[in-house]
């Protein structure tokens, strides 16, 4: 997964959903600590698939964009 594509897509949908900080995004997932979320944000390849799905569901990312991120 390309980290830049992941971050840019997340930021795009965060704006649409009025989630203006990564901390608010983290609150919608089961990620417990800020440190862990920061680690995942910097290297999306480390994100477990279940958590990745939670992030995408929270942001209402369409299937097409999800598939682009996984390529």
Model-derived regions, located:
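A short, Lys/Arg-rich alpha-helix, primarily the initiator
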Residues: 1-26
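Residues in the recognition helix of alpha-helical DNA-binding motifs
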Residues: 13, 28, 39-40, 69-70
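Short C-terminal boundary/hinge segments that cap the last helix of small helical domains
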Residues: 60-71
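Residue-level signal for the short linker/turn that defines the boundary of a DNA-recognition helix
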Residues: 19-21, 32, 50
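The alpha-helix within a helix-turn-helix
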Residues: 26-27, 56
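Core residues of bacterial helix-turn-helix
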Residues: 29-30, 59
């Amino acid at each position: 997964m390309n980290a830049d594509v992941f971050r840019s897509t997340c930021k795009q949908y965060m704006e649409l959903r009025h989630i203006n900080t990564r901390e608010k995004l983290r609150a919608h997932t089961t990620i417990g600590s800020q440190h862990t979320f920061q680690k995942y944000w910097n290297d999306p390849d480390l994100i477990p698939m279940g958590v990745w799905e939670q992030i995408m569901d929270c942001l209402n990312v369409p299937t097409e964009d999800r598939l682009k991120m996984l390529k």
